[in-house]
Amino acid sequence: DAVELTAPQGEVTFEHVDFSYVPDRKLLQDICIEAKPGMRFALVGPTGCGKTTLINLLLRFYDIDAGRIMVDGRSSRDYTRASLRRAFGMVLQDTWLFEGTVAENIAYGCPDATREQVIEAAKRAHAHKFIVQLPSGYDTVIGEDGGTFSQGQKQLLCIARVMLTDPAILLLDE
């Protein structure tokens, strides 16, 4: 029976992982990665080389063909999918903002967050400086697609949203 991942420390290890979407056509072969708590770790490579697939495997959207993925010294398969996914904060390349204020967009994952917590998350994401220059600061209403914000500003807002949840492990997909 799967157990809850509580108080994650942030250690992630891929041990000789193989994966294929189509049988007999390996996409990833013998992948070995070790990331310790507090470590910054970057996967770099051309589009289509498997970076996002590794994230999907880590979050158990797909099962691996061989090897093991360990989180805090235990197989990721030992944890419930829901508790495993709660341990991670993720910002994708494609941003998602909704119609509402800047503060509401940042607080999306933590609706009970205080204004001070929202501002602190924005500062940690390096978004505070541009937010306070907006006509109404954190109370500026933005459209569903992010309005006139640059792609970089949209990503900073999404990073602030994740920072507010204070995940044990932060994943940034390009």
Give residue spans per PLM region.
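ABC-type nucleotide-binding domain
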Residues: V3-E174
